[in-house]
Each structure stands twice: as C-alpha cells, then as structure tokens.
Amino acid sequence: MNRSIGVLDSGVGGLTVARELMRQLPHEQIIYVGDTLRCPYGPRPEEEIRQFTWEMIDFLVAQGVKLIVIACNTATAVVLKEARQKLSIPVIGVIDPGARAAVKVTRSKRIGVIGTKMTIESNSYEKALRHVEGQVVVESLSCPPFVPLVESSQTSGPYVERVVANTLKPLLSYDMDTLILGCTHYPLLAEVIGRVIGPNVQLISSGDETALEVSALLDYNGITADLDRIPEHVYHATGDTRSFERIASDWLHHPVQAKRLVLGTEEEKCV
C-alpha cells in the first residue's frame, strides 16, 4: 500500500526517528509534521499537549496516512492510548520501543532516563521499563534546557557543553550502565551528553526500535509499500521553515524543503 507514514513531533526532534525509518524502510514515504511554533511541549499543561497533538494527528489523518508515529515522548505519554482507541489506523509511540532497547543492552539493570518535565513526571518510562524487566532500577531527570538548544540549532560548542554538564550533574553520581534519551530531540545532543556522562554508559535512542516496530506492523497489516517505489517525503513545520530546513537537511543528509502549516484553526492548511 503506497500511502504515506505520518510522523509528528513538537519540533525537529522527531527527525531522529524519521531518519531511522528512512534507513530501515527505504521504500516508505513519510509526511512529517513538526509543531516548531509551539515547541517545547514538556512544560505545557497536559490538556494543551493533548490539543496540539490531536491537531497534528487530525491533519495527518486528513492526508490519508496509513500509520502514525507519535515521535515525541511527551505526546506519547499523554495521547498514545487515546489515539489507539479512537483511530482505525495503527499508532505507535516512542516510549515502549525505547524501554525495550534499554533492557536489551543493560547488564546492571540500573538505567537512567532523561526527558522533558511532562515525560519524567508521568513515570511513563519507569512503567514501561518495569513491564519489560521487573528488577530494573530507574533514576530519572528532567532536562528543560535541552529542547530549546536543539530547536535553536545549538548542538555543540562550549556553551552547550556547559549547559549539558550543569543539567546532568544530579545523574553523575548514579551508578548506571544505560541512559535513555527520553526525548527525540536529545540524540542531536548525543555527542555532548556522551562526553559528560562518560564512556561506560550506553546511550539509548528509541529511533531504531521504533522503526523495527513500524516495519512489523506494516507487514502484519499488509500495508507495506511496493519495493520499486521511490518515496518523496513531505515536511511541514508550524514555525520558521528556514530554521527547520537547515536542521533537517543537516540531520537527514539531504536537502529538505518544508511547507508552513497553520494548526489550531477550523481547517488546518499549508501556507
């Protein structure tokens, strides 16, 4: 089935998942929506996160997508269960895949989780980890400065190193062997996070495991794309498209052109 896969995020972070989808499923076409105008979602009230996420979901459904990936940990924590109940197409989040990936690699069963305020306060990762491995010990930390850094294209340099080091300081005394990057923005800071946290801690991003789950669901539902299909990915951003295009082009390693999307109106539209 040559309909597109819909991928949504509060901003550019979901591109880390989209890149893995493109790598593992090269014949599948993606429609990406990043709500860069209203990013970050983490500090927002739950009802606001729910409203904004449903606006993106409704837009993607109107585009005729065959499957939706909520490539935002905060939105996954708030909306995934509800979306699965209400929609007739498969919907995948990024928390369960991230938890499974962490349990696969940990030896000590001591796992750290970093994420947005909402994701950490929801305890979604702790629940998901304990569902997979009941003996796991989890230490979580909210990292509010990280998403604004990524959205403003600041992913390296002395200032970023300083911010990351100061933010992660409470975790440095925790004896863990695995750290979940519990926000899809955070892999863009992975090099800096890795230097701060040390070489003995494995960093986990949910992109790879999420793509595996998407592949399995496409096969199970008989909706995989034709193998001779050449996809033309489509990108939408609610904020500054030039900034989005710059970050997306760097991360995806190919030129990206984005359409401006207006959400929150009676009829979502591209401008």
UniProtKB/Swiss-Prot annotation:
GO terms for biological process: cell wall organization; peptidoglycan biosynthetic process; regulation of cell shape. The active site is at residues 72, 183. It catalyses: L-glutamate = D-glutamate. InterPro entries: Asp/Glu/hydantoin_racemase, Asp/Glu_race, Asp/Glu_racemase_AS_1, Asp/Glu_racemase_AS_2, Glu_race. Its EC number is 5.1.1.3. It is an enzyme of class 5 (isomerase). SUPFAM superfamilies: Aspartate/glutamate racemase. The keyword Protease does not apply. Keywords: Cell shape, Cell wall biogenesis/degradation, Isomerase, Peptidoglycan synthesis. Substrate binds at residues 9-10, 41-42, 73-74, 184-185. Pfam families: Asp_Glu_race (PF01177). Pathway: Cell wall biogenesis; peptidoglycan biosynthesis. One of its GO terms (molecular function) is glutamate racemase activity. Belongs to the aspartate/glutamate racemases family. NCBIfam families: glut_race (TIGR00067), PRK00865.1-3 (NF002035). Provides the (R)-glutamate required for cell wall biosynthesis. PANTHER family: GLUTAMATE RACEMASE. This is Glutamate racemase. It comes from Exiguobacterium sibiricum (strain DSM 17290 / CCUG 55495 / CIP 109462 / JCM 13490 / 255-15).
